[in-house]
Amino acid sequence: MKILNIEHFSEHDLIKRLRGLTMLTDTNTKPYEKAFISLENIAIDELFPAQRYVMKKELDKVRDLKWALEDKGYDLFNLNGFVRLTLDGVEEPVDLLPPVIEERIEKNGKIVNIINDGMHRVYSAYLEWVIPQVIYVRGLPKELPYYAYAIPEKDWKQIELLDEIPKTFIKKWHRISDNKKLYRDFNSTFKNVGGPRGNTK
């Protein structure tokens, strides 16, 4: 992977944009507007995955991205804000944020730190014995939880490494039938979040 240009944005810029982002199907609702948002380094064993798998090819991309960032003097696991990347072979810039973690109090009173975005990066941190810097969001509206439940056991050994996702595989356990109503639209205030990261080397 070749990074042609990096533009760094501060923690202040990151949080300001997060407060302005909207829901995917309701552009008038801003789930993070009044939440407590901070950058924190949180140990992997304090984070709850909702996604029950990681893709091997995506892990490879994350590792390539980490190495490419290191060549430019940046740490994938400690961005201290966010970066806008121009990648060789990719037409539009891509915004790379720290993983997004949302605090949620479940029905049984358990407080869980759900991984909203950045599962493959968090899993990479797990493999590399790193305590990653994450975006930690607390105080969300109760009616706007993350769209899937966290895995109750919080057991990272249960996460399956896949080449392809089988048709019958349960990727996540959704909270509601129309789960897209609970999607956050990161691209309402950022550029191409989740876009190409390493389709070329």
Language model features with spans:
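ADP-ribosyltransferase catalytic core
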Residues: 130-142
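Amphipathic alpha-helical interaction segments
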Residues: 17, 40, 44, 56, ...
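Short, low-complexity, polar/charged sequence segments that are solvent-exposed and flexible
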Residues: 119-123, 134-136, 153-156
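A structured, charge-rich N-terminal accessory region that forms the first stable segment of a protein
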Residues: 12, 17-29
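A sequence-level detector for short glycine-anchored, His/Arg-bearing signature motifs
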Residues: 109-128
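Amphipathic, charge-rich alpha-helical segments that serve as recognition/docking helices
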Residues: 139-201
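Short alpha-helix boundary/capping and kink motifs at helix termini
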Residues: 1-7, 24-40, 44-114, 133
